[in-house]
Amino acid sequence: MHHMTLAEIARGLADKKFSSVELTQTLLARIAQLDPQINSFISLTQDLALSQAKAADERRANGESGALLGAPIAHKDLFCTQGIRTSCGSKMLDNFKAPYDATVVAKLAAAGAVTLGKTNMDEFAMGSANESSWYGAVKNPWNLEHVPGGSSGGSAAAVAARLLPAATATDTGGSIRQPAAFTNLTGLKPTYGRVSRWGMIAYASSLDQGGPLARTAEDCAILLQGMAGFDPNDSTSIDEPVPDYSAGLTGSLQGLRIGVPKEYFSAGLDPRIAELIHNSIKELEKLGAVIKEISLPNMQHAIPAYYVIAPAEASSNLSRFDGVRFGYRCENPENLEDLYKRSRGEGFGSEVQRRIMVGAYALSAGYYDAYYLKAQKIRRLVKNDFMTAFNEVDIILGPTTPNPAWKLGAKSSDPVAAYLEDVYTITANLAGLPGLSMPAGFVDGLPVGVQLLAPYFQEGRLLNVAHQYQLNTDWHTRTPTGF
């Protein structure tokens, strides 16, 4: 049962081949057996899962149906879950039980999804390797000595190891797409505002977006259907109708214009990855797509702009964790200032502290114009480059990452080296565009992803292109040895 996709599970439940309770028990046993190898979960919710599965089976018995009804999933541990620890991978929130469900959690629960647990992540979603979690690093099921990507590494590793068919994740600078690439999954970052951020603990509010991680585009369509939609509780949520993503997976790629930015294939890209990306392009050409070279001239400025804007927003968002209202509080503070300093110093890890410092510096009186304002101007240029490109093409294609997954600890002492791994993904966050990563092959036994970007609210187009590609390739069906 553990090898089934979400779509296969939906068919199996509808045909009464097994019950949601049976499936849930099977996967919980598998998690208990295998997760100690990869450390993908922070919290397991066995009792909740079994009660939700039982309720889903009863709903089916009463004639209800639905692709997510009785389907097991997990949530990245920054989505608030009522009465269940929501840690954000941090000592700071190790004791925090949210008083309410995030909109994404509530919507999926209403659709009948079964929550198996909360997945590990880089602390406060800051990282590209899932090594900054207070609960320990997550290991890549394809090679346990390598990182799974971050910050949604727990969700990615759990799905890749077949512990469950799909999971929620978030993407601020590539945190869905990069782990998807590193673990041979399909991951989608929706348009900014497509999925509610209410109850999703913020890292950088103008960049964060929730989305699905699964093995196939078909499964991403099912999970996104349950996550997307307008939410009046989120002031950045956009009131745009949500199409039927699964029904849209049947479109022909004949005449589809795919833009390939020349900047993507400059120095820094592993030549073996470049070859796999070119193979993907040939496959899409066979399906009728037309390839056109384009330019994104301001892409080279994206990383410095992102690493000013994101930490600046983080320094503001994380100021609420002060040892007073909720979260970690130091012992025996001498006075209020000591309480603040020690609670934050002891509660936050080194990467989070680094980004808070960078952000506070960029926002300080003497440097605001030089850094933050300039970064926002670059953000506008990056967005304009995409608008120009999408006048000529329907989709933009390139690598998801410049390199395959690196070894655990390999970039820990050099944060800038890790930041540079985000070069292909952060532009979509700066511009607010939807982006998808799908499996494209392997380098030294490690998975490689190809990234697709589309205009605003064209998630359906991304999913259809990925689905047609997956009907004609088998990379996404490969399973890591031992899982």
Curated annotation (Swiss-Prot):
<protein>
    <recommendedName>
        <fullName>Glutamyl-tRNA(Gln) amidotransferase subunit A</fullName>
        <ecNumber>6.3.5.7</ecNumber>
    </recommendedName>
</protein>
<dbReference type="GO" id="GO:0030956">
    <property type="term" value="C:glutamyl-tRNA(Gln) amidotransferase complex"/>
</dbReference>
<comment type="subunit">
    <text>Heterotrimer of A, B and C subunits.</text>
</comment>
<keyword id="KW-0547">Nucleotide-binding</keyword>
<feature type="active site" description="Charge relay system">
    <location>
        <position position="76"/>
    </location>
</feature>
<dbReference type="GO" id="GO:0006412">
    <property type="term" value="P:translation"/>
</dbReference>
<dbReference type="Pfam" id="PF01425">
    <property type="entry name" value="Amidase"/>
</dbReference>
<dbReference type="GO" id="GO:0050567">
    <property type="term" value="F:glutaminyl-tRNA synthase (glutamine-hydrolyzing) activity"/>
</dbReference>
<dbReference type="InterPro" id="IPR023631">
    <property type="entry name" value="Amidase_dom"/>
</dbReference>
<keyword id="KW-0067">ATP-binding</keyword>
<dbReference type="InterPro" id="IPR036928">
    <property type="entry name" value="AS_sf"/>
</dbReference>
<keyword id="KW-0436">Ligase</keyword>
<feature type="active site" description="Charge relay system">
    <location>
        <position position="151"/>
    </location>
</feature>
<feature type="active site" description="Acyl-ester intermediate">
    <location>
        <position position="175"/>
    </location>
</feature>
<dbReference type="InterPro" id="IPR020556">
    <property type="entry name" value="Amidase_CS"/>
</dbReference>
<comment type="similarity">
    <text>Belongs to the amidase family. GatA subfamily.</text>
</comment>
<dbReference type="GO" id="GO:0005524">
    <property type="term" value="F:ATP binding"/>
</dbReference>
<keyword id="KW-0648">Protein biosynthesis</keyword>
<dbReference type="InterPro" id="IPR004412">
    <property type="entry name" value="GatA"/>
</dbReference>
<comment type="function">
    <text>Allows the formation of correctly charged Gln-tRNA(Gln) through the transamidation of misacylated Glu-tRNA(Gln) in organisms which lack glutaminyl-tRNA synthetase. The reaction takes place in the presence of glutamine and ATP through an activated gamma-phospho-Glu-tRNA(Gln).</text>
</comment>
<dbReference type="InterPro" id="IPR000120">
    <property type="entry name" value="Amidase"/>
</dbReference>
